[in-house]
């Protein structure tokens, strides 16, 4: 439990994203099929890309996604993440300091 639990109307899920079965986890916690915001920032950025590939975009949609890829580190995470998100209908709205991409879905 946390200090904001009584004020929150959505679940707080804490765990190791590298091991999570997102479809099962989201279903267990009654995550809506359309989620307002997803933020992804794991270390190293190659792990963030691995986790991104496991998000069930075929079932869940996010209005806004911020995805930290640390492009300035030249780890090869920028293009694969962009291709994956664009394949699922996300539009790259903004890149911040060659470090983070902001995506939106305009069809929701």
Positions of PLM-derived features:
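Glycine-rich adenosyl-binding loop in Rossmann-like folds that engage adenosine-containing cofactors
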Residues: 1-33
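Conserved acidic-Pro-Pro-aromatic motif
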Residues: 25-27, 31-108
